[in-house]
């Protein structure tokens, strides 16, 4: 964004030098500010306000571009996450605190993922991470980092509740299926993890889980 702001000013300054007497610098400033405003507005359209992460529209655009480009040399992996206890938080502490839990989940994931991938909130209590990988080992390593960040937050005791995620993943390569298949595989993998955690007594068995 800063580059978009500076380019018209630099051009205006150069033109001012050649066309003395014309107020071209301020014209450049005006154009720069308009360009910056338009760019900020475009970026805002792809950001989920509650979590501060990218939204579903941005996620769809990334997958579409990846598909059109024929895929990258390295595979595209997706890790889907679901906040296990959001319904309980809403029921016990109110929806305002439920919104805060979504915001906290976004911060936990941002701290874990860093620049390794793109973070999006799909809606409700579901998030997804997209990342280019060279081996499946990288997925496991990132999952471990996420778990460590979750533990760190929960042990801080900052809230009267804990944040926990069910997670699932899949790897997308163009020749192996469609985008829809990719998303369905991740979703199925995540709910298998949730089912396993319910079976192990880690999660309560809720028929309608949020």
Predicted features, each with a name:
Residues 1-50, 57-67, 118:
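Signal-transducing coiled-coil linker helices
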Residues 55-77, 87-114, 120-124, 128-129, ...:
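Conserved long alpha-helical elements within nucleotide-processing catalytic cores of c-di-GMP signaling
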Residues 78, 127, 165-169:
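A structural signal for short, well-ordered beta-strand segments
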Residues 129-134, 171-173:
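Short beta-strand-to-loop capping motifs
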Residues 140-147, 151-158, 164, 171-203, ...:
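Catalytic-core segments of nucleotide cyclases and related cyclic-nucleotide turnover enzymes
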